Every structure is written in C-alpha cells, then in structure tokens.
C-alpha cells in the first residue's frame, strides 16, 4: 500500500491517442441560407482524424479524491482536396445534304480546397475519485474543465473552362475563369467540459501505472464544434 494512505502531491506523464471529431456548420444549398452559400464541400464539414501527443499533469492526492491540472498540445490537422467535373452544355448538329457538322460545348469545373484545424493547447483541471478495490488496483472516474485554444482555416477555389469542339477542328477552350475564392480563418479560446475514467495500478508505494480514457467537448468556434476521445497510458509519481 502507499505510504501515508496515498496522500500527497504527485506528477504524471502520459502518452495519449486522440480521436478528433471536427464538425463545421457551413451554409447549405437551401433557403434561407442560400445567399450565404460557400463552396466548402462535405469533406471539410465533418472531419474524422486522430493524433498522438504527450500530456503532463500535477496534482494532489487526498487519499480517495484527487485534483489535477494538466497541459497538452495537439497535432495540426492539414489536408486538401481537388475535384473536377465535366458537363455538356449543348450541341449543334449543322447537317446539309452533303455533310454533317457537329459542334459540342462542354464546361469543366475545377475545385481546390485546403483546410487546417489545430487545437494548439489545452490547460485542464480535473476532480477524480479513486475506488480502492485492493492494495494494487484503483479504478477511477472524474470530471474535467479545460481552457483550450483552437485555430481553424479553410480556403475553397473554383474555376470554370468552357470548350467548344467542332467537327473538323481542335477543341477551342475559353478560360479558365476563376470564381471568387471562399476563405475563412478563425482563432479563439474557449472553456470546455468533459469526463475522465481509468484504472491505476500501484507498481511501488510511490509509482502508479495509469491507463485512462477521457472525453472532452471543446465547445464552439463560431460555426465549428470540436470534440476529442482520448486513450492514454502513463505513470504517476507521488512525492
């Protein structure tokens, strides 16, 4: 068993695997928001990604209840998407008694999107209760409040090229004609809430192996919501 009934200050270091869920409420192609429509695709509306990052904590064990402050930095999500579509706008079949002249008009639309999302830092405070099953194993649950700083940026560009293909000649392109780019960049600090759970395994009276899970809702960054599910493995040392 731990000396002093487990009471005292402690430090903890963890390596965490975070499943990140990023949801953007960009205007849809329906009224009443049609006038605000952006060219951002669903690819950047609902992002599912992950990262591995270190986390450090300092706290105090009261012999059942623990209070801990933690700090973590997350990996920056950065991605891009290119798409192209071609559609026929019309055709003109100029037929005579001796020949046929077919003109086809097509439109090629190119769409390039680039987006980033970064939870640059998270500073949290947790209240945790340890269930002492025996001298070694201590499952725990708790609640967490955290102050986080997040950044989000997206840029979407479209261009159109119209091509007329004649019966006896090569295709004649007109363009490309770029549309105004859609660009949005935001950075904000917010207060979020979550829950923690896990199990501690005492290796020595002062050293504990910790396997944990935490869920955190970072709140809303204008039209963006950010949530993380994290699994971690670390060690806790009590002084």
UniProtKB/Swiss-Prot annotation:
GO terms for biological process: symbiont-mediated suppression of host pro-inflammatory cytokine signaling. The keyword Transmembrane helix does not apply. Residues 1 form the signal peptide. Residues 92-106 have a biased composition (Polar residues). It comes from the Bacteria. InterPro entries: OMP/PagP_b-brl, Porin_opacity. Keywords: Cell outer membrane, Membrane, Signal, Transmembrane, Transmembrane beta strand. It is found in: Cell outer membrane. GO terms for cellular component: cell outer membrane. Residues 90-112, 160-184 are annotated as: Disordered. It holds the Pfam family Opacity. GO terms for molecular function: porin activity. Belongs to the opacity porin family. Implicated in a number of adherence functions. OPA proteins are implicated in pathogenesis and are subject to phase variation. This is Opacity protein opA53. It comes from Neisseria gonorrhoeae. The lineage of its organism: Bacteria, Pseudomonadati, Pseudomonadota, Betaproteobacteria, Neisseriales.
């Amino acid at each position: 068993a731990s000396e002093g009934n487990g009471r005292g200050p402690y430090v903890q270091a963890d390596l965490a695997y975070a499943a990140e869920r990023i949801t953007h409420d960009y205007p849809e192609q329906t009224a009443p928001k049609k006038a605000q429509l952006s060219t951002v695709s669903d690819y950047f509306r609902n992002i599912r990604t992950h990262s591995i990052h270190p986390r450090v904590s300092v706290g105090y064990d009261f012999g059942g209840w623990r209070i801990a402050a933690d700090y973590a930095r997350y990996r920056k999500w950065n991605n891009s998407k290119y798409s192209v579509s071609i559609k026929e706008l019309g055709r003109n079949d100029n037929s005579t008694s001796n020949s046929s002249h077919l003109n086809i008009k097509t439109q090629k639309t190119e769409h390039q999107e680039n987006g980033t999302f970064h939870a640059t830092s998270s500073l949290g405070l947790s209240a945790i209760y340890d269930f002492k099953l025996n001298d070694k194993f201590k499952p725990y649950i708790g609640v967490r409040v955290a102050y986080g700083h997040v950044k989000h940026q997206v840029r979407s560009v479209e261009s159109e090229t119209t091509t007329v293909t004649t019966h006896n000649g090569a295709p004649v392109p007109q363009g490309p004609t770029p549309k105004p780019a859609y660009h949005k960049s935001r950075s904000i600090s917010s207060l979020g809430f979550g829950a923690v759970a896990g199990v501690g395994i005492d290796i020595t009276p002062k050293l504990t192996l910790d396997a944990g899970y935490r869920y955190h809702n970072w709140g809303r960054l204008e039209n963006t919501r950010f949530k993380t599910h994290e699994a971690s493995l670390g060690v806790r040392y009590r002084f």
